[in-house]
A protein has these predicted regions:
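Composition-driven detection of intrinsically disordered, low-complexity segments
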Residues: 6-7, 30
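A conserved mid-domain beta-alpha-beta active-site/ligand-binding segment of alpha/beta enzyme cores
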Residues: 252-281
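Catalytic alpha-helical scaffold of carbohydrate-active enzymes acting on polysaccharides/glycoconjugates
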Residues: 40-249, 274-297, 303-347
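Short, positively charged and aromatic/hydrophobic N-terminal segments
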Residues: 21-24, 30, 35-42
């Protein structure tokens, strides 16, 4: 970043690279042409690549077949390196079981093996529960999961479930390259290459590790031919994200309805979590009588894959399946449908 070029925005002064500003302004003009953006500051650096449209100003969303609530169960199949080439504390893209993170170049066996439980045992237990219920999973995978834990991915493929690209390694977060677009593009490109090699087709969507992306991420994904991103958790409906290569769809993920939040951030019991899941489902289903809504449930095998949590999932799935107007779907299906129908929702 060139400290010699200063751009004033409002009353604050920011030191920014002029080439970067020009690129952002060009991109914002492209977005404005397509999406009529109205709230862009001098640099665009404080503006997200979509319009702020409150749900009260949208037309009713009608899902395929007249369904009311789109329900997506997301299973995150992630991989963590045992050590990193760094003496900085290793953030693994989620809270540890034991606190006080160790340096990245020192093996942290308790936390590593706790996470590995999900790969060795927990994921298979969860697969059984969802297969018995006849419920499809949307499975996100790190590229290293595909390379190092191929049997998990082969099982998902054999069931015809969705696979979503989910970064290269879970602890390598995209914001590490926030000021180096070429490095971020290289990481994403390599992730997508492994996806295509293992899955046998090109990826359609992306979820960033720890949901942490950069200003460049949507543009890089769209230029690579992807149709959706899942990083923005600001809605109960999909919407368009504008890029220089055309729009892609945000299919929202959720931290609120997420096993990490239930069991590790809030120390909830399975009974508490079931009450919260059913409460979320019931209210969204009630609201969806007038406009379609979507609900995402985020799961991690090392969190949810323990024996004492299985009945919790069976009970929730049974509750949801008693409602006929639920669309049990995937992110790719939602994105493909929304790209064709968004004009009847947000004009």
């Amino acid at each position: 970043m060139n400290a010699g070029r200063t751009v004033s925005r409002c009353t604050a002064a920011c030191t920014l690279d002029s080439d970067y500003i020009l690129a952002r302004q060009t991109l914002l003009r492209l977005r404005a042409d397509v999406y009529n953006a109205r709230s862009i500051d001098a640099t665009g650096l404080n503006t997200m690549p979509y319009d702020w449209v409150p749900i009260t100003r949208r037309k009713p969303l009608v899902w395929p077949g007249g369904k009311r609530l789109a329900l997506i169960v997301t299973m995150n199949c992630e991989f963590w390196d045992l050590v990193k080439d760094s003496d900085k504390p290793y953030y693994a893209g989620g809270p540890p079981m034991l606190p006080d993170p160790m340096p990245g170049n020192v093996a942290d066996f308790p936390n590593f093996t706790w996470r590995e439980y999900g790969q060795r045992v927990g994921v298979w237990r969860l697969f059984d529960v969802f297969e018995e219920a006849g419920v499809p999973l949307s499975v996100t995978m790190n590229a290293k999961t595909a390379l190092e834990r191929r049997e998990i991915i082969d099982h998902v493929k054999s069931r015809g479930w969705e696979l979503v690209a989910h970064n290269y390694e879970q602890g390598e977060l995209l914001p590490a390259h926030a000021f180096d677009e070429a490095a971020e593009r290289k990481l994403i490109t390599e992730t997508l290459r492994v996806y295509e090699q293992v899955v046998g087709k090109k990826a359609k969507g992306w979820l960033s590790s720890s949901l942490r992306s950069t200003l460049h991420t949507p543009d890089i994904l769209a230029a690579a031919g992807l149709t959706f991103i899942c990083d923005y958790m600001n809605d109960d409906q999909p919407y368009l994200v504008q890029t220089a290569s055309g729009p892609i769809v945000n299919v929202p993920y959720s931290i609120e309805i997420n096993d990490f939040t239930f069991f590790h951030r809030r120390a909830m019991t399975s009974k508490d979590a079931l009450e919260m899941l059913c409460g979320q489902f019931d209210e969204l289903y009630r609201e969806s009588k007038t406009t379609g809504k979507m609900m995402n449930i985020g799961l991690h095998p090392h969190i949810s894959g323990h024996p004492h949590r299985m009945q919790f999932f069976r009970d929730f799935l049974a509750h949801a399946k008693r409602h006929d107007e639920v669309w049990w779907t995937t992110r790719e299906e939602v994105a493909a449908w929304y790209l064709q129908n968004h004009r009847s929702h947000i004009a």
